[in-house]
């Protein structure tokens, strides 16, 4: 069973309500219990059934920033067992705050590819999301698309759509370029990319896809699952967008590294009162059943090779992901923010 405490319940009302909520969570479950206290920034209701199949999950939901701050303020008395969040950059922030403890699990190390987990076992990726390109079917020949780097070419002047630089997905994409190419080359790429923006960055990933359909720009950078949601929607407006926009996997040509991938990941918190159950929960998330559920529930890519992908997503082709260890997405995040600010990506 999942007991859910939403962001609104958890944070509205200030310290008194927060203290009351935390006090109501069990500090330690019985030795035989499969009970954990899960702090999660994954805002997908489809996850609830997955948690129910594990055991008793007391779920506290908020943004990653709020949860990290909360865990820090709770200190040694925190009831939290696991932090589950989107983006390796956010996992890095929690890591830098000293919130995780290393996990030694042969099952996790065997199941989860090395590039999708922390080198020291502080956290593990459990879903993948690709940051892909979207393009206008009417105005763009897909043969003209190739790589993220090529989006800085003059032919795309006034045609590129993307979220603001503060978005962690863009910070992580830029961090991957720094890890691969170094800072000077990444700066040049960013300068060209910003010069090609169709408008000042605004909105979320779905807004970029919709802006292509509206004729505001021709090419957008956004995560893979947002378009799949539109494809599955019964809203005629969403179907109109799908008819006008297609998906493209960049950096997958001969000799290319592969498309940038990021993860949703989780780690056991330093003061976890239910450590054994927390590790069991992580191992459960790496099971074939849980991986299939992630794929079907939120249109994400499983991290376990061989687990079936959602058929609508699979219809776009096989993902060739960049093998870069995703821990680099956090390591270079401060440099990403600085460079993006310096070149005027607002």
Curated annotation (Swiss-Prot):
Keywords: Ion transport, Iron, Iron transport, Membrane, Metal-binding, Periplasm, Signal, Thylakoid, Transport. It is a peripheral membrane protein. GO terms for molecular function: metal ion binding. Predicted to be exported by the Tat system. The position of the signal peptide cleavage has not been experimentally proven. The keyword Signal applies. Pfam families: SBP_bac_8. One of its GO terms (cellular component) is plasma membrane-derived thylakoid membrane. InterPro entries: Ferric-bd, SBP, TAT_signal. It is found in: Cellular thylakoid membrane; Periplasm. Belongs to the bacterial solute-binding protein 1 family. Probably part of a periplasmic ABC transporter complex futA1A2BC (TC 3.A.1.10.2) involved in Fe(3+) ion import (ferric iron). This protein and futA1 (slr1295) are subunit proteins that have redundant or overlapping substrate-binding functions. The differing subcellular locations of futA1 (predominantly thylakoid lumen) and futA2 (predominantly periplasmic) suggest they may fulfill different roles. This is Iron uptake protein A2. It comes from Synechocystis sp. (strain ATCC 27184 / PCC 6803 / Kazusa).
């Amino acid at each position: 069973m999942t007991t859910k405490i939403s962001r609104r319940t958890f944070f509205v009302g200030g310290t008194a309500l927060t203290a009351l909520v935390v006090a109501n969570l069990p500090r330690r479950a019985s030795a035989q219990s499969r009970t954990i206290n899960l702090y999660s920034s994954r805002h997908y209701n489809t996850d609830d059934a997955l948690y129910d199949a594990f055991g008793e999950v007391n779920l506290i939901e908020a943004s990653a920033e709020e949860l990290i701050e909360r865990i820090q303020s709770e200190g040694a008395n925190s009831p939290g067992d696991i932090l589950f969040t989107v983006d390796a950059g956010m996992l890095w922030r929690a890591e830098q705050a000293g919130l995780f403890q290393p996990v030694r699990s042969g099952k996790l190390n065997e199941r989860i590819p090395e590039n999708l987990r922390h080198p020291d076992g502080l956290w593990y990726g459990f879903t993948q999301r690709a940051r892909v390109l979207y393009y206008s079917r009417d105005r763009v020949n897909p043969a003209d698309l190739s790589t993220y780097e090529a989006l800085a070419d003059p032919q795309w002047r006034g045609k590129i759509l993307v979220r603001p630089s503060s978005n962690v997905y863009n910070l992580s994409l830029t961090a991957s370029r720094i890890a691969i190419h170094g800072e000077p080359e990444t700066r040049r790429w960013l300068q060209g990319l910003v010069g090609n923006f169709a408008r000042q960055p605004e909105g979320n990933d779905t807004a970029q896809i919709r802006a292509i359909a509206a004729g505001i720009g021709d090419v957008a950078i956004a995560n893979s699952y947002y378009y799949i949601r539109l494809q599955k929607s019964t809203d005629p407006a969403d179907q109109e967008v799908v008819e006008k926009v297609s998906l493209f996997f960049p950096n997958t040509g001969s000799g290319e590294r592969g498309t940038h991938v990021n993860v949703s990941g989780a780690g056991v918190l330093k003061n976890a009162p239910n450590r054994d159950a927390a590790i069991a929960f992580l191992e459960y998330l790496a099971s074939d059943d849980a991986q299939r559920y992630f794929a079907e529930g939120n249109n994400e890519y499983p991290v376990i090779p061989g687990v079936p992908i959602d058929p609508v997503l699979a219809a776009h082709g096989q993902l060739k992901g960049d093998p870069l260890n995703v821990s680099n997405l956090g390591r270079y995040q401060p440099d990403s923010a600085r460079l993006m600010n310096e070149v005027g990506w607002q």
